[in-house]
Amino acid sequence: NVDGMRMSVALTYLSIARHRLNLTIRGEVFVRKVRFDDRKAIGVQVESQGDIFNLDAEEIILCGGAINSPQLLMLSGIGPEQALKDLDIDLVKDLPGVGKNLRDHPSAFLLFESCMDQVGDDPKAQQVGMRFTTPGSDIRNDMQMSPIFMTSEHRPDTIPLDPDKNYLGFSVALQKALSNGEITLKSSDPTEHPTLFYNYLDHPEDLRRMREA
């Protein structure tokens, strides 16, 4: 927001609405699958505090995101017929496209030693980002570049860092990838995470554009 705070759905909406009498917020409720009567969705099967039960309603809005949405559809019997049969999931609808065309934004974090005596630490300057079209690309604004300096146990330093020197970091991210992957189920157990095949940079044009950036 204008104060430099990273906003979320909880901060933006729930914090001002949680005291409404017609609103109940309950955590730790796990959706196992969508329930069908023939081919009509009538509710969901959920698990909460060790109990498994059904919630049926005229309207249920289920927001599973890019990963859990196809996972729940397949667990519920909607997806590639043979894959569901192999896991003994009752078929509701053969829909081969469920779980396909998974796309993400591959990125590279670059770290450099600075030739300047001092690197600026103005927070506003560090929030600058740039979208641009990679040379030779037919897709406009397909690349994003931003200043970033981030290290952790998951992303260790690429070069030894000297506390007496200054460094610059950049992030280059492909925002409109052509490579695509898929999501597949490991089992019919909804608590088991699905397998994700991202196929990053599988398309030669993605690889070329990342090199150009």
Please describe what each predicted stretch is.
Residues 108-212:
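FAD cofactor-binding and catalytic pocket of flavoenzymes
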Residues 12, 67-71, 79, 125, ...:
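Generic recognition of stable, solvent-exposed alpha-helical segments in well-folded globular domains
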Residues 1-8, 83-96, 191, 195-205, ...:
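Rossmann-like flavin
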Residues 40, 49-53, 179, 192:
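Short acidic/polar mixed-charge low-complexity motifs
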